[in-house]
């Protein structure tokens, strides 16, 4: 109850300022300097006044559409002294105003609470200052706003998103789009911003035989999901009804947001049925103008192409995505692991090289797998390989696979473990629950593709093992692969494979992902971890294959200096043209996204000179010729 009273008091105090304001500086939202065109920063430096105006305007013009404005605060703000504002508590309010603000503040508390499986504190703090507090920080610690958006519109329908988008466009607000906030590069947060939160849009609709708008071709069974549906919710529905989709390993990730629009990789299913974007049949999108459009091969094909790999929060807000479903068939899973001292050369030249050789051999037989490397201590590491024989529950074949694996590993003289099980459904092999992580645990990530040419070469497995032998990893770090090749690279010329992903994806055998832990919740530790990831670990990952520099944007280096080329390559030129067509004023902004080079680092100022953008455009044109 005390939290609610404090929250109401905060919101109520903010409204007092309304009486002293005739009109906020909405009509003059842009200021000019020698180097940039910026949002009106003075507006954001008095958030209590702006909050009052926003609540009033939402109450008067938006509440009739059911849009609720929420005040978003740090995870630990309810337990600590907030530095967001220093407002007086003397005022008078009507009962209806109190009711509105109680609802608003309760929403804000719920949306800001951290969860053990969402290590998001890294992108609440600033790059150089500890600007927010955490649930387990000292009780007397001050709480600041950090990179948490100031306000959030918790939407439940498409028309509510339209209202919120037009509101942001009209008042030139720095806009952030969020579903689960499951992002390791801070794309769903932003200082001094206005957030559209789509997590309540939970519609799931199955189609026996989907036909896209404007088409007379039946595309087979499919499922349409709302912007707030998670992979776990979709997996559960599919397990009940007998189908699966290509999705990631973490069930708390959103199904239609950044995961899908950034490409969508499965550790094993992509090898069989392609990337998630290869399976998209249609999007429903709210554009920067607030219009609703349907995008598929027949309607608005340009933005349909861009949304299949160009990244979330960039071209519009996807309110519904329709994708192919696949039979929830049986699968046999084989698991093998080796471990030993990190300085034991045999572990790398025989054990881990052996695992990569096994993976290569099984890939050539049409069986995908995932390699995982994790430290057990400062001196010991564990390497494991999980293989998925899909569309079979033949225990005899599984036993034969195990025997071939055993023969390879016994020749290494290293200790190993081996196990196998057959499951009636693929969905039984998918994770049901989220990661439960230590208190204040945060992560950042990096990734790189490995080409089929390298992986399938005679020296490929040994080369990978030797590259990883000296790869620096902390006690909570993790390195894992996602199996590409197969149907990711097959039939490249087919229309449904024409996505905006970097063309290198169609030439890759595996994606290597590195998860770098940030265990101490301070801006200093965050900055140190980011710099080490960028300057040390990512450099070593790119050195695996210097002439094949392609990365996965969804798990990319937050400090990536060549984003346009490593994420999109020759496709960037066309993506930028589509961005300018559908969002000419850059209402939608995504960190290291298409067009982001035109903005300053804090995302509040737009550079007057587009030299950097022109350079990226030129590099993309050159790359187009190389990949032809």
UniProtKB/Swiss-Prot annotation:
Its cofactor is FAD. Keywords: Alkaloid metabolism, FAD, Flavoprotein, Glycoprotein, Oxidoreductase, Signal. Residues 1-20 form the signal peptide. The modification Pros-8alpha-FAD histidine is found at residue 182. GO terms for molecular function: FAD binding; oxidoreductase activity. Glycans are attached at residues 343, 382, 487. Its EC number is 1.-.-.-. Residues 144-328 form the FAD-binding PCMH-type domain. One of its GO terms (biological process) is fumigaclavine C biosynthetic process. Induction: The expression of the ergot alkaloid synthesis cluster which leads to the synthesis of fumigaclavines is positively regulated by the brlA and stuA transcription factors. Ergot alkaloids are known for their toxic effects on humans who consume contaminated grains or livestock that graze on grasses harboring ergot alkaloid-producing fungi. Due to their strong affinity for monoamine neurotransmitter receptors they may also have clinical uses such as treatment of migraines, Parkinson's disease and cerebrovascular insufficiency. Pathway: Alkaloid biosynthesis; ergot alkaloid biosynthesis. FAD binding oxidoreductase; part of the gene cluster that mediates the biosynthesis of fumiclavanine C, a fungal ergot alkaloid. DmaW catalyzes the first step of ergot alkaloid biosynthesis by condensing dimethylallyl diphosphate (DMAP) and tryptophan to form 4-dimethylallyl-L-tryptophan. The second step is catalyzed by the methyltransferase easF that methylates 4-dimethylallyl-L-tryptophan in the presence of S-adenosyl-L-methionine, resulting in the formation of 4-dimethylallyl-L-abrine. Belongs to the oxygen-dependent FAD-linked oxidoreductase family. This is FAD-linked oxidoreductase easE. It comes from Aspergillus fumigatus (strain ATCC MYA-4609 / CBS 101355 / FGSC A1100 / Af293) (Neosartorya fumigata).
């Amino acid at each position: 109850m005390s939290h609610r009273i404090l929250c109401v008091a905060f919101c109520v105090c903010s409204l007092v300022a309304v009486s002293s304001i005739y009109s906020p500086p909405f009509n003059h939202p842009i200021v000019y300097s020698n180097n940039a065109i910026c949002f009106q920063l003075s507006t954001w430096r008095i958030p209590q006044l702006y909050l009052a105006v926003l609540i009033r305007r939402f109450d008067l013009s938006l509440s009739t559409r059911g849009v609720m404005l929420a005040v978003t605060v740090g995870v630990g703000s309810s337990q600590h002294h907030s530095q967001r504002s220093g407002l007086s508590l003397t005022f008078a309010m009507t009962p209806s105003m109190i009711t509105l603000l109680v609802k608003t503040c309760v929403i804000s508390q719920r949306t800001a609470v951290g969860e053990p499986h969402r290590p998001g504190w890294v992108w609440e703090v600033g790059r150089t200052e500890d600007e927010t507090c955490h649930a387990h920080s000292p009780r007397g610690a001050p709480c600041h706003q950090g990179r948490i958006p100031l306000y959030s519109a918790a939407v439940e329908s498409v028309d509510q998103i339209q209202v919120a988008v037009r509101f942001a466009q009209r008042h030139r607000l720095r806009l952030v789009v969020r579903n689960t906030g499951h992002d390791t590069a801070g794309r769903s947060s932003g200082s001094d911003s206005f957030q559209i939160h789509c997590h309540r849009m939970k519609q799931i609709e199955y189609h026996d035989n989907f036909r896209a708008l404007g088409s007379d071709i039946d595309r087979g069974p499919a499922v349409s999901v709302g912007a707030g549906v998670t992979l776990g919710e979709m997996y559960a529905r599919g397990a009940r009804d007998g189908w699966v989709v290509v999705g990631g390993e973490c069930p708390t990730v959103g199904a239609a947001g950044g995961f899908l629009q950034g490409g969508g990789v499965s550790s094993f299913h992509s090898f069989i049925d392609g990337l998630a974007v290869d399976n998209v049949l249609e999007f429903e999108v709210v554009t920067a103008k607030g219009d609703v459009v349907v995008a598929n091969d027949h309607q608005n094909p340009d933005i349909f192409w861009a949304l299949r790999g160009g990244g979330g929060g960039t071209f519009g807000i996807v309110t519904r995505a329709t994708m192919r479903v696949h039979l929830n068939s049986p699968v046999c899973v084989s698991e093998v692991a080796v471990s030993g001292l990190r300085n034991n050369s045999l572990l790398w030249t025989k054990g881990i090289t052996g695992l990569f050789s096994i993976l290569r051999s099984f890939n050539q037989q049409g069986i995908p797998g995932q390699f995982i490397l994790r430290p057990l201590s400062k001196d010991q590491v564990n390497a494991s390989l999980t293989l998925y024989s899909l569309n079979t529950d033949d225990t005899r074949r599984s036993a034969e696979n195990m025997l071939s694996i055993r023969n390879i590993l016994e020749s290494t003289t290293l200790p190993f473990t081996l196990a196998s099980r057959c499951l009636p459904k693929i969905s039984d092999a998918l994770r049901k629950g989220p990661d439960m992580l230590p208190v204040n645990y945060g992560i950042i990530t990096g990734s790189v593709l490995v080409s089929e040419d390298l992986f399938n070469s005679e020296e490929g497995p040994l080369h990978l093992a030797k590259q990883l032998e000296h790869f620096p990893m902390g006690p909570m770090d993790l390195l894992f692969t996602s199996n590409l090749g197969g149907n990711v690279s097959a039939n490249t010329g087919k229309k449904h494979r024409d996505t905006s992903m970097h063309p290198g994806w169609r030439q890759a055998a595996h994606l290597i992902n590195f998860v770098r832990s940030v265990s101490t919740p301070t801006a200093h530790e965050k900055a140190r971890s980011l710099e080490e990831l960028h300057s040390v670990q990512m450099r070593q990952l790119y050195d695996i294959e210097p002439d094949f520099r392609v990365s996965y944007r969804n798990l990319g280096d937050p400090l990536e200096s060549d984003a346009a080329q490593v994420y999109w390559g020759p496709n960037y030129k066309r993506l930028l043209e589509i961005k300018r067509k559908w969002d000419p004023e850059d209402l939608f902004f995504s960190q290291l996204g298409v067009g982001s080079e035109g903005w300053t680092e804090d995302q509040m100022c737009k550079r007057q000179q587009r030299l950097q953008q022109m350079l990226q455009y030129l590099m993309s044109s050159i790359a187009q010729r190389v990949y032809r």
